[in-house]
Amino acid sequence: MPITTALTTEIQRVSILDEHGQFDETLGKDLIPNDDLIKLYEEMSLCRKLDEVAFKLQRSGRMGTYPQNMGQEANSLGAAYVLNQDDWLVTCYRENCGLFHRGLPPEQILLHWMGDERGNNIAPDLCITPIAVPIGTQMLHATGLAWASKYRGEKRIACTFFGDGATSEGDFHEAMNFAANLDIPVVFFCQNNHWAISVPGRIQCSAPTVAQRAIAYGMDTIQCDGNDIFA
């Protein structure tokens, strides 16, 4: 039998702002109204300020572990902006901006990281799950929530966030495989900052892109510039 090609594929990468912050009028025109842009910028500024306060609290011994969101504000906010209010937002620990946009008060973030369980007492109508600290577990939760919505005939999805290091966890593969096989309406949003805790991305994953891992499960996949809210 001759050697044949079983699969060829490509992964698109979307970026509306270039590396100098210049806006592509052709690609980005009318994506976000000006009034909304101002509100989104205010929310990113609030997230950055909370980060500064929380970091000082942590360094002064008044707060335990606190993972900073600095530099990753745009990605969770952009996702939260385009989701419907009843879609599930299933986060880990660097999505403060998306949580603010959905309506979670900043003080609840601080309560959570200071060990006060009232920080996890989230209003049901916000459709937000408690912040997941164990690496990767939230992906299974999101898959289950989206599966339940599909079973009930609801027109809603779940969007779950995780870092590149989480793609080496078993929970990631279980969730992806289950979601793909049952055609579950869930978005797996990988925030690749090229560090798996203290391990560089090039060491924890030898694939050229994290996005290509979705191809193995028969899923659609795309790369977006995580610092570009238009993307």
For the regions a protein language model found, what residue spans apply to each?
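N-terminal glycine-rich anion-binding loops that anchor highly charged ligand groups
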Residues: 14-21, 42-55
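Residue-level marker for buried hydrophobic side chains located in beta-strands
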Residues: 161, 188-189
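Short, ordered loop/turn segments at secondary-structure junctions
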Residues: 94, 191-194, 226-227
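Conserved beta-strand scaffold positions in the cores of enzyme catalytic domains, especially
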Residues: 16, 221-223
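Cofactor-binding active-site loop characterized by glycine-rich and histidine/acidic residues
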Residues: 49-52, 56-182, 200-206, 211-218
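Short, proline-centered helix/strand-breaking motifs
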Residues: 185-187, 220
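Charged, compositionally biased N-terminal leader segments and the immediate start
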Residues: 1-29
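Structural signature of the thiamine diphosphate
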Residues: 5, 230-231
